[in-house]
Amino acid sequence: MFCLYYFIFQVLRLVVTLLNTSNDAKTLSICCYDLSQFIQNHPSGRMIVLDLKAKGRIMSLMEHDNPEVRREALLCVQKLLLRAKYASYLQS
C-alpha cells in the first residue's frame, strides 16, 4: 500500500510541475482536470494540493486566454474551495 501512495504522490508532483512550467493550453487544462479529480476522489486531496502550493497557479489560470483552460481552472478552484459533494453538484 505504501508503494501505491508513493507512486500517486510522485505523479501528483509531476502534474503540479507541469502546471507551473507549461504554457501549452491543452497541457494546462488536463493538469487542472487531473488535480480536480484528485481533490474530489482522495479523502485529503484538498490539503495535499494546497501543501503542494498549486492553488495560486490554478487561480491565475482562471484568466487564461483559452476558454478550456479557464473552464477547467474554475472547476478545480470550486473543488478546492468547496467540499467534494457540493462541488460535484455544481459541476452537473
What name fits each language-model region?
Residues 1-92:
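Long amphipathic alpha-helical tracts in eukaryotic proteins
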